[in-house]
Amino acid sequence: MGLDNGILIKTRQKLSPESLPLFVNIEMDEYKMADEGGGYWYEVCYWRKCWNIRNIILDIISSKENDDGIYALNKNDIRQLRYALNGYILNPYKWDDDYENGQTIWDSSVMLSHLIRDMANLAWLENYMDNHKVYVEFYDSY
């Protein structure tokens, strides 16, 4: 079973920590991607051994085509993911149920701050998509 999943964005303009709100915490090291269109790639969210989150995202994007485990996401997909993650934040016992059932190796005491950061990053991304041309993708290492 695979290990890693996440959300990457491609922007036309380079991001810097100074250009982001204080509550946003994304990976600022640019990813080197093999695409010919130029642009800058950044990782907005990353999950390791969180099969529960992977399953939620795959349910959201179930009808989409994929290219070797890469799925394009739109604003509605991001909104649905935020709603699902918020359920874990408001009810950590749901995360612990997933932990007990082998859907993740992390209990809620480890993941709660991570999920809150993900929510902030996704809220920023949803807003950023309103005013910027950005390509968003979910990668699935399975």
Listing of model-derived features with the role each one plays in the protein:
Residues 1-135, 139-142:
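Acidic (Asp/Glu-rich) sequence patches and key acidic residues
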